[in-house]
Amino acid sequence: MIQGIHIHDFFSSGLPLIDVRSPGEFLRGHIPGAFNIPLFSDEERAQIGTLYTQLSAEKAMEKGLEFAEPKRQWYLDEACKAAPGGNVAVHCWRGGLRSRSFARHLGENGFKRIELIKGGYKAYRRQVLAYFENPLNLAIIGGYTGSGKTEILGTLASLGEQTIDLEGIACHKGSSFGAIGCGPQPTTEQFENNLFEAFRNVDSNRPVWLEDESHNIGGVNLPLPLWQQMQKSRTWFLRVPREMRAMRLVSGYAGFGPGVLTEAITRISRRLGLENSTKATRLVEGGLYFEAALIILGYYDKSYDRALSLHSRSNVIEIGVDSADQEINASLLIEYEKGRRTC
């Protein structure tokens, strides 16, 4: 039985989801957890589009049927892997001919419940972008590079706090060194989808802890409304001594070797200055990572000060700490956020 379902109802349905768009469309952005069973390859889709614009819809449809016919059994085999129970949701770009044709094929071959996402992926994207326009209950962890903000975020999660790791979702640590040890980044569109997935189940009555970030994290951008809300939210700025931060950076990066690290220094050499970049490079090549980290932190501290100036100053609360221990600092943040301590 084929029916239509709104995207917000799909989320609570528990149904497996099949995305029949082309591989390229899926790669640019998809609903997290969806299975891609493309009705057409990227090349086939391009050919059909050309026929549609240059000849007629009828010719385009004929070519689509020609491409699809040899793959009918493959569609079924893949759909059975994705939804072995015979219940499934299906979508294409706008909930049009591709998803309807695929759903009909499943219905004719034993699938029991088939839900078509109304409006398709386009409707989902509208919901994603609209979500970040809503007021969000955020608590921001601020601090200079090397303060251990990401580790503190993980500790907060283990203590039962609501957290979202923006850098983890972006697959980037947010600096010239940020790609080191990370996999490939998603597209900005997919990053937004993954963020929405992380946010949509949070309890809005409790704060969500985020790490303070620039508008861009590596090659992806935060949704502008989210980033603007972050600038206006409570920001707990942990002032950790520079030497402790340098030691943390050495612990996190020295293992990748001098070649990778000097490449990262080269990327910021203009901003670091010729003298500092040359000196830092030589120190790294000589294995003096701590001394190099102190030089690099001089640049990043100034850069962070400029970024911090974009925040609503009345919402930035500075906390001086004499430890880089994530357990201690996470517990301290909880006490401040819940009003058990005052600055």
How does the language model describe each region?
Residues 1-32, 60, 129-133, 138-142, ...:
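Flexible, polar/low-complexity N-terminal or interdomain linker segments that lie immediately upstream
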Residues 62-118:
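Catalytic cysteine-centered active loop of the rhodanese-like fold, especially the PTP/DSP P-loop
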Residues 97-98, 139-158:
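Glycine-rich phosphate-binding P-loop
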Residues 11-83:
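Positively charged, proline/Ser/Thr-rich regional signature most characteristic
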Residues 158-229:
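Conserved nucleotide-sensing/catalytic segment adjacent to the nucleotide-binding pocket
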Residues 113-129, 250, 261-264:
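Long, charge-dense
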Residues 18, 35-37, 115, 139, ...:
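Hydrophobic/aromatic beta-strand patches that form the interior of the parallel beta-sheet core
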Residues 229-235, 239-343:
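Conserved NTP phosphate-binding and transfer environment spanning the P-loop NTPase/kinase superfamily
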